[in-house]
């Protein structure tokens, strides 16, 4: 069966609440460890997300946990809670040996929807690592997420377009080739975003 990413929040309803598990009284570090327990991961995630910036130190420390499920969960949390100090750590997590962690890291770097007023990272921080993974990461899921991040800069950086065109032409995965094609001239996302002003496209407010 192919691996399918399931957002943690999609699993919330069938599971116990944080109050039932006593997580309201649990310290941040213990909650981060619970991200590696399939029976408690969703409730721990919700409680850490509720604590927000107050839990950031423990979440960042969790990026170095030996359990890849903990590292993945921390990347997902930073999707919502990312700040200036966390961006470099997320870039480093894209090199994680577990592909699920790399996927979560690239999503956190590329997605504005979850971040409220947080500025997006600029090309100086993320474009070269994203291009490298798009070209050579062994996992197609990671390459697909890298394409999304590279695509954010397709209107502002020729390196992004060149990398996406190469991926669209040569990637061994049809899914990655298709996604890369969305972000090059003539592609659906590229042409739709071309109608927006530069400020509306906004990957260009660097942290």
Tell what function each PLM region has.
Residues 2-23, 29-33, 38-53, 58-64, ...:
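Structural detector for internal amphipathic alpha-helices that build alpha-solenoid repeat scaffolds
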Residues 182, 186-207:
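Terminal, low-structured helical/coil segments at or just beyond the last alpha-helical repeat
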Residues 136:
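Short, Lys/Arg-enriched segments at the junction into DNA-binding effector domains
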Residues 87, 122-128, 160-165, 196-204:
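HEAT/HEAT-like alpha-solenoid repeats
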């Amino acid at each position: 069966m192919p691996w399918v990413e399931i957002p943690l929040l999609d699993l919330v309803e069938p599971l116990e609440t944080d109050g039932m598990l006593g997580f309201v009284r649990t310290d941040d570090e213990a909650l981060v460890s619970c991200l590696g327990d399939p029976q408690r991961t969703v409730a721990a995630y919700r409680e850490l997300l509720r604590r927000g910036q107050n839990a950031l130190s423990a979440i960042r420390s969790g990026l170095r946990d030996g359990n890849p499920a903990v590292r993945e969960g921390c990347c997902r949390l930073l999707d919502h809670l990312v700040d200036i100090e966390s961006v470099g750590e997320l870039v480093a997590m894209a090199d994680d040996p577990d592909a699920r962690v790399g996927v979560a890291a690239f999503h956190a770097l590329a997605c504005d929807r979850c971040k409220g007023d947080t500025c997006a990272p600029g090309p100086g921080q993320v474009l070269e690592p994203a291009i490298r993974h798009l070209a050579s990461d062994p996992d197609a899921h990671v390459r697909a997420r890298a394409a999304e991040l590279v695509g954010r800069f397709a209107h502002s950086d020729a390196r992004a377009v060149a990398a996406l065109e190469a991926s669209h032409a040569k990637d061994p995965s049809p899914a990655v080739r298709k996604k890369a094609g969305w972000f090059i001239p003539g592609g659906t996302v590229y042409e739709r975003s071309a109608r927006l002003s530069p400020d509306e496209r906004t990957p260009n407010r660097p942290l």
